[in-house]
Structure formats: C-alpha cells, structure tokens
Amino acid sequence: MQLSVTHPCCRTLILLLVSNLLLWESEAVLPICSVRNGRCFGSFEELLERAVSLSEEISKKAFELFTAFDSQYAQSHQLIVKSLKKCHTSSLDLPKPGSQAMQTHPVTLLKLASKLLRAWQVPLNHLVNNLPSLKNVSPSILSKAKEIEEKSNGLLEGVKSILIQMQNGDTEDENYPGWSGLASLKSETEDIRLFAYYNMIRCEGRDTQKVETALKMVKCKISNENNC
C-alpha cells in the first residue's frame, strides 16, 4: 500500500528529517552525514576535512574578536601593561615539534582537541551571557562571541564523531580543566571585569589555534605524510 505525504506517519518522518537537518546546520557541524542515536556520521575523510575547516573558521573569528576587544578597551584601560593571568587550560599543550609530535597518535591529538573544546563550553557560555553588561560594547563583539560559541559546540560534536569512528565506540574523556573566572566577570569594579574579559578572550584565541593545529596534525598523519 502506498502512503501519501499527508499520512500521519509520513508527516512525522518528514518532520524528523527536517529537525535533524536544522540541528546540524544550527550547530555548524558536518553537513554530509547520517544521524544515528543523535550523533552525526559521515565518511571519516568528510568528517575530518569539515572539522579542520571549521577549526580554521573559529580561529579566524577568535582573532577578530580579540582584535576588536583590544581596540575598543585595552588601550584606554591599560590592560596590556597588567600581568596576564595563566589560562585555565595551560596544562593542555600540543606535543613539541620533532620526534614527540611524530610519535603522537592521532587519537591522542583528537582527545586533546576534545578536552580543549569541552574546557571552553562553560566559559564561552558565560562570556556570551555577560558581555552585554559591558559599557558601550559593540554589536560586532557580541556577534563574534556568539558565533565562536556556536561553532565551537558544533566542532566538539564533530570531533566526538571522529573519535567514535576511530575507536569503534563512544569513549568520551571527561577529564578536562575546570574554569573559575565567573566572579571576576561579575565584579562590580569595571577594570577587574575588563581585564577578566581581556585575558579570557586572549586565552580562548590561543586555544582555538591549538585545536586547529591538533586537527591538522591528525589530518597529516592520516594522509601518511612524513613531515608531521
């Protein structure tokens, strides 16, 4: 028996397909994939290529955000001359160039990228929610921060999917650095808040470059190139 598109079960299926499509588009994740158990699966090469491309977009946007914030606030409030605080992710570092990098397994690099992205989920959420409280903050700064948060969440889902394919199962690593900078973001003293934002945006930009580099190293290793 043929069913028309007006049949209840067909309408339900169509709505499900549309909702899945919108979910992946809104998270800026990998566009060519099938969804199983709420996760995105495509060919390994497609997932990795899209992840690298998305990491490049995030790094570029993070640089633009830092430049915009630095231009609007850093000079006038002398933020640059203050002692910068250590980033909460400073323990997560890339392998050193040379033999250490060459011997590092792709899964180790993917887990590093995943930890960095997970470590920034809470801070980025607070950044986006609290930035509007800054005096004279520009719409450009707000939109860039929001875009970084959305794309970073999407990239995390992509990295998870790649790890699942490489390890034949979900082996999510929950061990990532915590963040304790909320009190400074909510300080009643404007200079304290500005410095907290400045240091946070600086650290986030540094870590987006780490993620990008880690994913490019994975791509290089999978391609069996000898110079990575």
Curated annotation (Swiss-Prot):
Main localization (coarse): secreted
GO molecular function, one term: hormone activity
Signal peptide: 1-28
Keyword Disulfide bond appears in the UniProt entry: yes
Keywords: Disulfide bond, Hormone, Secreted, Signal
Compartment(s) where it occurs, according to its Swiss-Prot or TrEMBL record: Secreted
Disulfide-linked positions: 87-203, 220-228
Pfam families in alphabetical order: Hormone_1
CDD domains: prolactin_like
SUPFAM superfamilies: 4-helical cytokines (SSF47266)
Coiled-coil regions, chain positions: none
Tissue expression remark: Expressed specifically in the placenta. Expression restricted to the junctional zone of the chorioallantoic placenta.
GO cellular component: extracellular region
Membership in a protein family: Belongs to the somatotropin/prolactin family.
Name of protein: Prolactin-2A1
High-level lineage: Eukaryota, Metazoa, Chordata, Craniata, Vertebrata
